């Protein structure tokens, strides 16, 4: 899309979450004729509502398909709204292009575009790239699935700026014209099949990131990915591979050191971010950063201090020789398996949460380094059961808040204290962020830091 594509065009914005508000605001700035549709009532006292109403925006507080007709030129939907929703289905039948907020925002951007997608590791990898670019003295603006709608930040950017986007499969489906200068796919696993229908459609959504790339642009792929040969064969972009071994084109390890283009940059033990999955994220971020002109010294300076994204196996602090990690985002068994396997030190494991019927016995093989289990939440008794099967001591508490002083008093120098619940938070907390914040705040209070 180009900026002129929206001028004087009739555009429906479907969904009134943060991205919908940002899209409506940006479309008004682009001189579009905007209608906003939402399934529920609008807060008419909200500043953005008042501002858009004054600008001539029409608001409709129902989402049946009578709201849309052939007079509309575009439908811009919230990425999370399924394509099976009545309004979206009707738009497609009427051949009305269905876009996301990101497509609207990119219509007016002509600087360097770096885009990151993948099933896992997107946010951590995007954050690493951002910090590496900044450490090298480059100016970069980060947006997308990482939390900030692109429309909120794109206005002041010029052709000299770099825009770094984290993109979900939901967003990519509504980006028909995206053409990144550098595109990265961290990995692809079967994910969001309730939204996409099957794995083939999910993979096709991920391919959208490179569909329009040309020979002077770069596509970075995981050398170990099952879909990598197919993507490499189909894309017009230059393919650059990353891998933990030396099949990588840019960065790899020999088991002891991080090696970038043949230079031994730093020992792996000096990297603050832990876990084999995070090593892949690091190598992917380095590959992007080197293509973007970042020095090895800048990369090293970031890896020495980057402790992770909040709530994602996030290093918090070391006190009295004990290292503390917040992995509240670990809402399923697989995530907690990854977290537990990231440490070889004696580990005090804090776990529990909403009981969704998961088989927690799958975690027993991952408990070899655990010295104490502290259990809470609806799954408390399931956690107790697997601890006993693994012959590990276990203590029950009522909440994360109560677990923290127990963990501190039970720890010794050289230990790791790990919150990795293996369950969603909704039995006791509104979301995993609130649960993780409680862990962080209680640590600070109990440790006096």
Curated annotation (Swiss-Prot):
Keywords: ATP-binding, Cell cycle, Cell division, Cell shape, Cell wall biogenesis/degradation, Cytoplasm, Ligase, Nucleotide-binding, Peptidoglycan synthesis
MF-aspect GO terms: ATP binding; UDP-N-acetylmuramoylalanine-D-glutamate ligase activity
Catalytic activity: UDP-N-acetyl-alpha-D-muramoyl-L-alanine + D-glutamate + ATP = UDP-N-acetyl-alpha-D-muramoyl-L-alanyl-D-glutamate + ADP + phosphate + H(+)
Enzyme kind, highest EC tier: ligase
GO cellular component: a single term: cytoplasm
Gene3D superfamilies, alphabetized: Mur ligase, C-terminal domain, Mur-like, catalytic domain, NAD(P)-binding Rossmann-like Domain
Gene Ontology biological process terms in this record: cell division; cell wall organization; peptidoglycan biosynthetic process; regulation of cell shape
NCBIfam families per the UniProt record, alphabetical: murD (TIGR01087)
Name listed for the protein in its UniProt record: UDP-N-acetylmuramoylalanine--D-glutamate ligase
Source species of the chain: Leuconostoc citreum (strain KM20)
Gene: murD
């Amino acid at each position: 899309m180009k900026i002129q594509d929206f001028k004087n065009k009739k555009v429906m914005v479907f969904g009134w979450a943060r991205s919908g508000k940002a899209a409506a605001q940006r479309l008004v700035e682009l001189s579009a004729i905007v209608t906003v549709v939402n399934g529920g009532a609008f807060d008419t006292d909200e500043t953005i509502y008042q501002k858009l109403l004054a600008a001539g925006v029409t608001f409709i507080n129902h989402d049946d398909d009578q709201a849309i007709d052939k007079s509309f030129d575009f439908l811009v939907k919230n990425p999370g709204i399924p394509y099976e929703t009545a309004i979206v289905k009707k738009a497609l039948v009427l051949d009305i292009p269905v876009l996301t907020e990101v497509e609207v925002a990119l219509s007016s951007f002509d600087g360097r575009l770096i885009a990151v997608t993948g099933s896992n590791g997107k946010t951590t990898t995007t954050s690493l790239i951002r910090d590496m670019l900044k450490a090298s003295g480059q100016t970069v603006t980060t947006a997308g699935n990482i939390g900030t709608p692109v429309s909120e930040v794109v206005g002041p950017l010029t052709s000299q700026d770099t825009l770094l986007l984290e993109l979900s499969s939901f967003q990519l489906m509504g980006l028909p014209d995206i053409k990144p200068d550098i595109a990265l796919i961290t990995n692809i696993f079967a994910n969001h099949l309730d939204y996409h229908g099957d794995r083939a459609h999910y993979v096709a959504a991920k391919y959208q990131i490179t569909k329009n790339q040309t020979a002077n642009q770069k596509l970075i792929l995981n050398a170990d990915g099952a879909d990598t040969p197919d993507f490499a064969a189909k894309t017009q972009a230059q393919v650059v591979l990353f891998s933990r071994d030396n099949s990588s084109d840019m960065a790899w390890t020999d088991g002891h050191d991080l090696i970038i283009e043949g230079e031994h940059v730093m020992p792996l033990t000096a990297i603050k971010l832990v876990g084999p999955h995070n090593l892949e994220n690091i190598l992917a971020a380095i590959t992007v950063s080197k293509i973007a002109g970042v020095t090895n010294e800048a990369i090293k300076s970031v890896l020495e201090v980057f402790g992770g994204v909040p709530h994602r196996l996030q290093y918090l602090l070391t006190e009295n020789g004990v290292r503390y990690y917040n992995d509240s985002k670990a809402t399923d068994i697989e995530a907690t398996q990854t977290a537990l396997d990231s440490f070889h030190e004696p580990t005090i494991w804090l776990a529990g949460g909403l009981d969704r019927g998961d088989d927690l016995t799958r975690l027993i093989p991952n408990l070899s380094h655990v010295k104490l289990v502290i259990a809470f939440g609806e799954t408390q008794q399931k956690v107790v059961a697997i601890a006993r099967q693994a012959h590990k001591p276990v203590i029950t508490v009522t909440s994360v808040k109560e677990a923290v002083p127990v963990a501190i008093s039970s720890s010794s120098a050289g230990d790791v204290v790990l919150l990795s619940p293996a369950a969603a938070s909704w039995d006791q907390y509104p979301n995993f962020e609130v649960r993780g914040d409680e862990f962080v705040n209680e640590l600070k209070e109990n440790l006096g830091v």
